[in-house]
Amino acid sequence: MSSTPAAGSAAEVATSSATSNAPSAPSTTASNVSNTSQPTTAGTPQARGGRGSNANGGASGSNAGGGDEPRKEAKTTPRISRALGTSAKRIQKELAEITLDPPPNCSAGPKGDNLYEWVSTILGPPGSVYEGGVFFLDIHFSPEYPFKPPKVTFRTRIYHCNINSQGVICLDILKDNWSPALTISKVLLSICSLLTDCNPADPLVGSIATQYLQNREEHDRIARLWTKRYAT
């Protein structure tokens, strides 16, 4: 006799639970049909709530709108890193070589901690009009080194038909005849050779080249004077 009310209560509880939790019971209520008829429309306010606004202006919207930019950086950064890595390794190798075995009358090394900016010292070649002088040069390596030549300029004033007042050097291996097989040591050797024997046929300062060809004595006198005045 006592089991009948228990069964009735259980039925009422089951009915109430089915009505209140209809979305969790598949294909049994109208509310569930409404939910299951749009399985892929998660963007509706009922399905997403606060996330719908985040997609437009929140973190997820920011990621969606700017996602391409980090991917582009991820693609380009390794190329730059590889280029810097190649040039840095090459420059470090040349630094070790020139430190252990510098060219005659030459020295070179980085300015402080910057591997791409060097300063060089060249002593005036013995027997030349620049003998006794100490000439300072700036050397700049680009990230494309050794596939592009270094930029080498005189900081010390010098009277030379192939070197202008800004210190720019007219030397073929620093321009069109550059090769990745060349090194900064070979460049400094070539500059020393240019101090010993200038090239008036390809001058950077035409007036000095003309004087060298037509009045060598006066040319040499002025070159020695400049060496004494600016390089000692």
Swiss-Prot record:
EC number: 2.3.2.23
Active site: C170 (glycyl thioester intermediate)
Keywords associated with the record: ATP-binding, Nucleotide-binding, Transferase, Ubl conjugation pathway
Reactions this protein catalyses: S-ubiquitinyl-[E1 ubiquitin-activating enzyme]-L-cysteine + [E2 ubiquitin-conjugating enzyme]-L-cysteine = [E1 ubiquitin-activating enzyme]-L-cysteine + S-ubiquitinyl-[E2 ubiquitin-conjugating enzyme]-L-cysteine
Region (Disordered): 1-87
GO CC annotation terms, alphabetical: nucleus
Pathway note: Protein modification; protein ubiquitination
PANTHER family in alphabetical order: UBIQUITIN-CONJUGATING ENZYME E2
Protein name per UniProt: Ubiquitin-conjugating enzyme E2-24 kDa
Gene that produces this protein: Ubc2
